[in-house]
């Protein structure tokens, strides 16, 4: 991953403003668009210690995740009082297993993730700088089974007004990254500089967007 020390340091210092304490309401609202059923497998890239993993595990028999930070993965299981089975996969990866959950530690690009029916990306693509996003998406495509679907949550703002992460990934870039896939914009939540949080960040506009991305069967 690009600049892994940045993320290791964030977790070590507990500087995790990107972490939501509750299940993402956008996941709850739009997951049905992926046509889920219990037998369909799910992958959550760069999953951190997301509460979304718990929610997804109640609806699917297999939920895989990958997270660079071992601190995050251990915290996830400890905070839920889960005792996972831990398997050393290689010098780079460990696998934490508990019921429906299979969480790998280490690099997203080399973790031995199995292909899945559905992918949920809430804070992964937007965490990556522009120079690595195409490589990230290519790996995502490799892990998606034919006919599979991706629920993607992104941000769109003027990148010159804030350094990121999270980075701005506008629709034009989504169209380029997922060329050949069916792309549907499900939701667009737009705020301008009259919104106090947006003004505080020095942004003129800010949009959170939800996409359904579908591969051919």
Curated annotation (Swiss-Prot):
Cellular component terms per the entry's GO annotation: cytoplasm
Annotated CDD domains: AdoMet_MTases
Key words, A-Z: Cytoplasm, Methyltransferase, S-adenosyl-L-methionine, Transferase
Catalytic activity: S-adenosyl-L-methionine + a thiopurine = S-adenosyl-L-homocysteine + a thiopurine S-methylether
PROSITE patterns: SAM_MT_TPMT
Compartmental location: Cytoplasm
Example of a GO MF term: thiopurine S-methyltransferase activity
UniProt record similarity statement: Belongs to the class I-like SAM-binding methyltransferase superfamily. TPMT family.
Protein name, UniProt field: Thiopurine S-methyltransferase
Origin species: Vibrio atlanticus (strain LGP32)
Gene this chain is encoded by: tpm
């Amino acid at each position: 991953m690009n600049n892994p020390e940045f993320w290791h340091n964030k977790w070590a210092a507990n500087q995790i403003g990107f972490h939501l304490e509750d299940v993402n309401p956008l996941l709850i609202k739009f997951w049905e668009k992926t046509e889920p059923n219990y037998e369909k497998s799910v992958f959550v890239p760069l999953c951190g210690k997301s509460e979304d993993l718990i929610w997804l595990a109640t609806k699917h028999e297999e939920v895989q995740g990958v997270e660079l930070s071992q601190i995050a993965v251990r915290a996830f299981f400890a905070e839920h009082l889960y005792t996972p089975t831990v398997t050393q996969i290689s010098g780079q990866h460990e696998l934490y297993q508990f019921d429906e959950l299979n969480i790998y530690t280490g690099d997203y690009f080399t973790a031995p993730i199995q292909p899945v029916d559905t992918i949920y990306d809430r804070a992964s693509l937007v965490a990556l700088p522009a120079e690595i996003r195409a490589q990230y998406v290519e790996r995502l495509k490799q892990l998606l089974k034919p006919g599979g679907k991706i629920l993607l949550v992104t941000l769109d703002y003027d990148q010159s007004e804030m350094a990121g992460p999270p980075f701005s990934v506008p629709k034009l870039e989504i169209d380029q990254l997922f060329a050949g896939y069916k792309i549907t914009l499900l939701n667009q939540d737009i705020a301008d500089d009259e919104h106090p949080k947006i003004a505080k960040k020095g942004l003129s506009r800010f949009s959170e967007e939800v996409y359904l991305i579908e591969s051919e069967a």
